[in-house]
Amino acid sequence: MALAQIPTLTVYAPDYFTSEWGPGPSIESKFEETCNCDLVFSAGELLPRLVLEGQNTRADIVLGLNTDITKKARDLGIFSPHKKDNSRLKLPSDWDDEIFLPFDWSYASFVFDTTKTKPPSSFEELLNLPKNIKIVIQDPRSSISGLALILWVKKIYGDNAGEYWQKLAPKILTVTKGWSEAYGLFTDGEAAGVLSFTTSPAYHIAVEEDITKKAAIFKEGHYPFFELAAKVRSSKNEELASMFMDFILSDEFQDLIPMTNWSYPSAQTKDEWPSVFSDLPRPKSAVYFSENEASEITKQAIEEWRNALSQ
């Protein structure tokens, strides 16, 4: 007698999430212990792929979208309400979105090697670092962290954002397509600072016992970065997909996030974080655009950045 075929849950996620050092492998094995299913991660860029596939996407779940691109993602019309209790979330701001469910969060920040320079405490201090101190950033057209920086600068400087980029340009060693390449240049010693997140130093402390990498905390406030999950409307595995969305808020999932995705878990309080995270300095305030504001201003903000850096 043939064995019944177990269902497959297809989850789209970024490369870093599914890599051997990311949370993907452990999440896969833990969920499969209880779901009687085969969880298959499909790694790669998310939004361009979803735009291309539209209603024909093979995904049941999408993991790794962020708040600066949710307007575009929402307008695709391919997601259904998650139907989970948002009050279970422990975030620095209220969350009432019915489509997108955060699974982790952090703040955009510049991380510096303190053996090379003292981290600046403001955007203006960043400009005034010694001439030999260089930073690496990511391209906002291909990187969600790069986009967060563009919007962060735009929120702080408004109509003067282009002028700020002109002043910062000499400090930028290079612009990379993605976060991994930029962070690699930083850890290889090519630059003293890199655009990353306030939680990034936790990796160096916990894994390398290196306390020389520190996030610069700016007095102007920092741009929050939420990573999101969404359930695909056309999924043939609606029950499994709903189970996975529940799983995201469970301690089993949330416990994995800090030490594999190096971010704060979305459904746990500070008391539940590993001590290396609860001890990290955090910004006193968050500055950000709403979903609609970010969608409306992104093109202009990128153009100001591009024009300034091409001069």
Label every model-predicted segment.
Residues 274-311:
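Extracellular/periplasmic bilobal clamshell ligand-binding domains
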Residues 24-39:
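Short alpha-helix C-terminal cap/hinge motif
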Residues 109-116, 154, 225-238, 256-259:
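A bilobed periplasmic-binding-protein/Venus flytrap-type ligand-binding module shared by bacterial periplasmic
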Residues 79-86, 98-102, 124-127, 205-223, ...:
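Short beta-strand->loop
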Residues 68-72, 187, 191-212, 261:
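A ligand-binding cleft/hinge motif common to bilobed small-molecule-binding domains
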Residues 89-93, 106, 165-169, 175-176, ...:
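Periplasmic-binding protein-like
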Residues 6-8, 12-23, 48, 57-191:
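Extracytoplasmic ligand-binding site segments that recognize negatively charged/polar headgroups
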Residues 232-289:
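Mature extracytoplasmic/periplasmic domains
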